[in-house]
Amino acid sequence: NPSSMWRHSSIKTLAINYAQTATAPDFHMWVQCALHQMKFANLPEPLLFYRIHQGQASKIHDKISESIQYSMELWISHLFPELTPKEVSLLSLILHGKSIKLRTEEFEIAFSAYDKVRSNNETSLFGEDRETMFSILDAHTQFLKKLLYQRTQ
């Protein structure tokens, strides 16, 4: 990511496998760093500027979405180990998907999975601020529930 800086040695020691995330390696790298409890900081000032062109990786939307889905599932499965693989997959889809194509039953499973993990917002596993994380996720899931139930009525 052009606005990120780190010591090469700190990332290299993680031996990250990018095979499943070739088109969104930066997102996968951040998930791996978090899983290894690396420290992050946001700096308010831009450190570099770059030009945008049609050939860059961010223009390949489907492949990027697949890579992000893979990394989201990895992250969610570690954040909430009590979820089944299906719950992890569906929850990650509703949390990151721009265009969500699920059946009503799948939405119900995802919402149920979210309700299950929402009750355990006290224990931070990787230094994440669970209060802030859940406030954002609450708003998002409530919005999706409202849309779904308006559509099905």
Question: At which residue positions do the language-model features occur?
Answer:
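Conserved nucleotide-sugar donor-binding catalytic segment
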Residues: N1-L74, E82-L90
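Membrane-interface aromatic/basic loop that binds lipid-linked glycans or pyrophosphate carriers
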Residues: L74-L79, L93-Q153
